[in-house]
Amino acid sequence: MAKLPVEKMRELERRFGEIEARMSAGPAADVYVKLASEYSELQPVVTKIRAYEKAIAELADLETLLEDKSVDREMRDLAELELPEVKEQIEALEQEMQILLLPKDAADEKSAILEIRAGTGGSEAALFAGDLFRMYERFSAEKGWKVEVLSASEGEAGGYKEIIATITGRGVFAKLKFESGVHRVQRVPETEAGGRIHTSAATVAVLPEAEEIDIEIRPEDIRIDTMRSSGAGGQHVNTTDSAVRITHLPSGIVVTSSEKSQHQNRAKAMQVLRSRLYDAERQRADSERSADRKSQVGSGDRSERIRTYNFPQGRITDHRINLTLYKLDRMMEGEIEEVVDALMADYQASQLAQLGEQQ
C-alpha cells in the first residue's frame, strides 16, 4: 500500500479550518456559496483524517501502556485486547483515505455531453444506438439528472444514426466517463426470419461539458453556416429551416444543431464544440502525463471495444475488467450502477498502484 501523504493531509486540515473561520465571519453571499461548496467537498476527507489521527494516538497510548512494566496485569490484558481492534481500524481508515486523497479529475463534478453513433450493422446498429440512449436516459432519471437532446438523426427502422444530448447534474462526468468506446450487440433482429444472431455496434463518447472559462474559442477560428434541415420526425427530432453548422477551422471539428430557433442552434452547437475542444485538450494533457495511459480503464479510446451485450444469453461483458453479468434486461432499463462502480473501483486501484510505484 502506498504511504499516506502526511503533508497533504495537514494542508487539507489547515484549509478546512480556514474555511470554517471565514464562513463564521459572515462573508458576502457569493463568497459564502463558494466557501460552502469547498467545505462540503473537504468535510468527508477531513473527518477521515481526524478519525485516523485519533486512532494513531490511541495505538501509541496502548503500546506505551504495554511497555510500562509498572501497569497491573488487568490493564495490560485489556490493552492487548484493544490493540488488534485499533490496528484493524487504522488499516481500514488508511484504505479509505488512499481513495479520498487520490488526485481529483477537475472535470469529475461537471455535467456531460453524450454522443452515440451507430456503427457497423446498418438498421440494427441504429436500433441499438437508440437502446443505449434510452439506457443512459433512464439511468440519468434515476439519478435526478436532466437530459436534453441537442441533435438527433433517426434510423430508417427506428433508433438513431446519431444522437447528441447534454446530461446536466453534479458529478455526471465522473459516473459516465468510462462509457466512452465501442459497444457491441449480439442479438436476433426482429426482421430475421431464420433466427440468426447478428452482430452490430455503436460508438459512445462522453465529454465533460465545458464552460466558457474552460476553453477560449476565438471568433476568427470558427465558420458558421446556416442551412435548411428536415428530419423524419419523432420524439427527439425537430424539423426546421434554421439548422446551424459550426466549423472550428484550426481543428477541423464540425458541429451541427437543428433546433427550431437559429439562436438556440448556435448556442447549442457552440456548447458541443466547446466541450469537444476541451475534451481534446484534456486527452492531450493526459497522454503527456502518462505514457501507458492506453492500458488503463480510463483511457477514453473511442475505437476500443469496451463492452458486449449478448441478448440470447442475457449477458453483458465489460472487456476492460473482465466483468460478466447475467442481468442484461435490467441493465438496458438503466440499472448500470454495478458496472459503473466496478469500472471506477478498477481505475482507482490502478491509480493507487501507480502511486505506490512512485514512492
UniProtKB/Swiss-Prot annotation:
One annotated GO molecular function: translation release factor activity, codon specific
InterPro entries according to UniProt: PCRF (IPR005139), Pep_chain_release_fac_I (IPR000352), Pep_chain_release_fac_I_sf (IPR045853), Prokaryotic/Mito_RF (IPR050057), RF-1 (IPR004373)
Gene that produces this protein: prfA
Organism domain of life: Bacteria
Claim: Cytoplasm is one of the keywords in the record: yes
Species this chain originates from: Rhizobium leguminosarum bv. trifolii (strain WSM2304)
Description of post-translational modifications: Methylated by PrmC. Methylation increases the termination efficiency of RF1.
Assigned protein family: Belongs to the prokaryotic/mitochondrial release factor family.
Name this polypeptide is given: Peptide chain release factor 1
Cellular location(s): Cytoplasm
Region annotated Disordered, chain positions: 280-306
Keywords for the protein's UniProt record, in alphabetical order: Cytoplasm, Methylation, Protein biosynthesis
NCBIfam families reported in the protein's UniProt record: prfA, PRK00591.1
Function in brief: Peptide chain release factor 1 directs the termination of translation in response to the peptide chain termination codons UAG and UAA.
Residues that bear N5-methylglutamine: Q235
Biological classification of the source: Bacteria, Pseudomonadati, Pseudomonadota, Alphaproteobacteria, Hyphomicrobiales
GO CC entries: cytoplasm
